[in-house]
Design a protein with these regions (language model features):
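Generic detector of well-ordered alpha-helical packing
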Residues: 10-13, 107, 139
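Cofactor-binding loop segments of dinucleotide-utilizing enzymes, especially the Rossmann-like FAD-
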Residues: 58, 135-137
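Short glycine/serine/threonine-rich phosphate/pyrophosphate-binding segments
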Residues: 137-144
Length: 146
């Protein structure tokens, strides 16, 4: 049995005090309930056991041509000039100790499967069990576990 830890959306824009979305409550909730600390424990455990870790985060092109204006979750991103690829906004929070040599997938929708290589990667690595840690249980975490 091959197992993978999937880390979803632990990004600055959602969790860092300087994030434009953080005031909506995710950052405070995660701090209050130790979400980042618990995710870090999982990451350390998987690394210690040489198990697969997959990092998933949002990331839109600089011109937002891959950001759907039909998406109720992200259609406002261009007006706030956030969640662009290769910016501080979508970097993983430093507390988790992200390593670029671990598999990283950029998504443009809530679902980490939508137009990404996630499914193909899981099949390629013969992953039969996943452990998921994310900051939006009702959104991205739910969509990957359904």
């Amino acid at each position: 049995m091959n197992r993978a830890l999937i880390i979803i959306d632990f990004i600055n824009e959602f969790l860092h005090p300087d994030g434009k979305i953080t005031p909506q409550g995710m950052g405070k909730f995660c701090e209050e309930y130790g979400v980042i600390w618990n995710a870090k424990k999982l990451i350390d455990f998987f690394r210690k056991n040489n198990e697969e870790i997959i990092w998933i985060h949002l990331g839109f092109h600089e011109n937002y041509d891959n950001c759907s204006n039909l998406s109720p979750r992200f259609k406002w991103a261009p007006s706030m000039w956030i969640l662009r690829e290769n910016t501080w906004s979508v970097e993983f929070v430093k507390e988790l100790g992200y390593k670029s040599e671990e598999k990283t997938i950029t998504k443009t929708r809530v679902s980490p499967f939508y137009k990404t290589e996630l499914e193909a990667y899981l099949l390629e690595k013969w992953i039969t069990e996943i452990v998921v840690a994310g900051v939006a249980t009702d959104l991205a975490v739910s969509s990957i576990t359904r």
